[in-house]
Amino acid sequence: MTTSVSPKSRSLFTAFFWLFNLSLLLVIFIGFLPFLAMDILNDALRGEVPFSILIPVFGLIGVPTTSTALGIQRKRQLNKISNLKPAAPLGPMPQPISLFQIFFGLEAPLLMACTIRLFFLRALTPASSFLFISLAVGTIALAHWLLHRHHRQSSWASWMHLAGLTIMLVLSLYLSVIALFYVLPLIVVMGSALYLSIFLVVLIPIFFPFIMVFSGLVMMPWGMLRLFLRSWRQTLQSLSQQHGKTLPRAWVGTVLAVWLGLLLLLQQQPQTQAFTLLEKQPQSEGERQALLQNADAIRKGLLNAYLSAYRYPLLEDKGMYRMYSNLLGAPNAVAETVQDAYRTVLTPFAYQGNALDKDKAAQLYAEFFDTPILRGEHSTIQNAVLSNFNRTEAKAGLLDIGAERVRLQQQDVSITPEGDWAEIKLHEVYANTTFENTEILYYFSLPESATITGLWLGETADLAQRYEYVVAPRGAAQQVYTDQVRRQVDPALLEQVGPRNYRLRAFPIPPAGRDLLPQDGQPDRMHLWMTYKVMKQNDQWMLPVLNEQRNIFWTQDTQRTLNGKPQQKSDAWLPASIPADVSEPASALQAKLPGGYVVAKPLAEQDYQLPQGQHFAFIVDRSYSMEAHRKELEDSFQWLKDNLLGANSADLYLTRADGTQAQKVSSLDAFDPGKTVLYGSLQTRQMLDQYQQVAEAQNYDAVILLTDSGSYELTQDGSPLPLAAPLWLVHLGGLQAAYDDATLATIQQTGGNVAADIKTVMTRIATQPSLGQGTSLLNVVDGYAWFLSSTPDSDVKTVEAVAPMAARQWIAQVSQAVKPDQLNQLDAIHQVAKENSIVTPYSSMLVLVNPEQKRQLKEAEASDRFNREVEDQQLPDPQDEIAPVSAVPEPAEWLLLLACFAVLAVWWRWKATRNEINHNLPPLNEV
């Protein structure tokens, strides 16, 4: 490339090149690397940073460093060339790549790409990814051309050079057009700086590197345009001399057509199609089937709309309008025109919709896919949240589900066997990995006969200093816990949220590095203890089964012990069970309660029966989420046909997502679960309402709903349903994590329950053992039959220690007759729970640490004490999270504060000077 550059211009650019790169390296290695970059790299080691974020981080460090190294190498090459004295004149010697070419051809495009990707874009779209790939291809083409331009090149290489330079020329022109919008504001800012320069002398050393970096970034698009235009023209002329003008020009046109076609194709955003497809409710099975065939397109479109704030950062942005209106004083019409033009130019980065589409997408997703979008698209949303250079903001937006904020440092399980039953104690130690107070949450399940008997919190392992629980009404306990979390005070709450489901929450886990405890010299930790009693089941002691955890995680470094003995590392929270001593056969037990005795009798395999001569109603959940469990549904119906229908009768009710009444099928043989259409969203209450609309006059021995694990967050508060038959929920694929209180009350009041398979339900319904007159059956569960007797059984050993389990079975039975508006009945049940220190559907355990919390609990117990709200109807929304504010500024914040004070000082001095000038001006009547 031949250029006619004056020595003065070359010297000025050389000075600019070195000043810019030295300033940029100063900013990067003093400001960017110690603060932002190190946070990103540390998170990357934990797997919390997408690879697309790591590339620009390394690029911002490596590009100016490499460019500076190339500049130094070029200087050395020039010195060597100047020292060469050829014996004969051989013509001009090939010159090394110029600083202009290094800066605008290599450094500028890569630096701009890294800056835009890291600071302005989060989750990449197909269009933005295509532009970055195009920029990389064009830069590689120029680099190859610069390295080989003095050598004979193959025809194929020349054509590729022309293609790459053509693409890069278009991109340079595109960036130059964007930069034009900043020309007038830049002139105004520079003019103001010149006007105030006399007052900025002291601040010049501080702001000079930033001024140089900013000036260089603004100059880059035009310098790139000039360089790539000259390189493109030279390559085009070279090929035209070899092949004529027509072929190279046709090649340029083809490259442009293909490139623009691909860009336009990738700019098509999928949310428009998704919204159109879901605009009207389908009225027939054929229409539903057609929508299901487009499920992938609908998923992509709704996800794109939901993540619009992450994928399209310029969504409804008014920055250019404010810049021209406020800074330049332009009329509103002019500022609006500039804003519209700016948005048009940035179409590849703009969202084709409005900010309300996010909520619309979340609602439509839940209605179509039968699960909250934050669950269904967890990994994609998590990746978008983590694609942020600001790690504090990224971590604040992390979904609590699966988030790794609090490490389980230690876990101790202690089992104290007492023959057929045992007391199990779980002790855990939590270490926060963040610098904010953090809540942990477990959803877990226990055997239905297991009974939780204690909960404690502590700041150390000293049992004498731990905070003890109180048994409180479920609504009052929830209210106090929620209020105390808002006040950043330590509480813990353990609730029963299903027949065998529990929710455990503890707050706050102390921030990492905090050490407020005297004389221990260790970072603060939180200790938690939980105890429960459980009957032996299949010669095993059953441990809690984790359904979901939030914020808590464990690693191979987590210390685990069982009865004081170290255990092997595990990826699971707890083992499913621990082998029990089988030397003694199971025997009956009894415990005394006020008003009678509760007897637990072990059952043998032959004691279990199947129904005979009964009439059942089977309700089938036909929502979209059941598609993942279609095989289990087919197996369940096959079992019913093989084992139940010959001796019993049944009606089938098929639910519908359109909200109409269920479809009744009189014969189960006529239903093929492999062909039924599974569509839309259905909750338990909706399906039962549809059933009741059709089956008002039917008398059934039991109502069985075949569903999946459900979505607790999509349920609504309500009242129990007045069903005439016991309600049993069969959760194919696993139990639901939690139930709303209305559904739980419906199950309890009808004498139903939940299970994970149809066989368990049928055997529990049919197995009705008896101990004779004066006794009544309470429950058949976990290998035991529980009875209530008015007198003690002389042949059965009385064990007062099993009274908590006996009280739990008694409460489960009397719950069938309890009305939710009868506080005296609920208070009586709660009193039994308090006397036996147990968790029940009506009574929760709350750990309180100060008198104020106890006073608040007493106030809460005086009013709406048993009404509990549905938790997390919407999961934590990362777009609503706000980065926490630290009480002590970080180093980067000190720099920002210094800059703010400097600006205020300059403004004050400028205002004083202007007032002085105005004061010295003569009055108007004297002019």
Where are these regions (language model features)?
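A surface-exposed beta-strand-loop module
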Residues: 454-456, 461-543
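Acidic, polar low-complexity linker/tail segments
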Residues: 562-617, 624-635, 642-643
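Solvent-exposed beta-hairpin/edge-strand motifs
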Residues: 373-399, 441-485, 554-573
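Von Willebrand factor
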Residues: 609-706, 710-713, 736
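Surface-exposed beta-strand/loop patches in extracellular or lumenal glycoproteins
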Residues: 431, 436-449, 542-556
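Pro/Ser/Thr/Gly-rich intrinsically disordered low-complexity regions
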Residues: 2-405, 451, 463-464, 702-705, ...
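Short, solvent-exposed beta-strand/turn "edge" segments of beta-rich domains on protein surfaces
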Residues: 410-425, 429-434, 446, 517-521
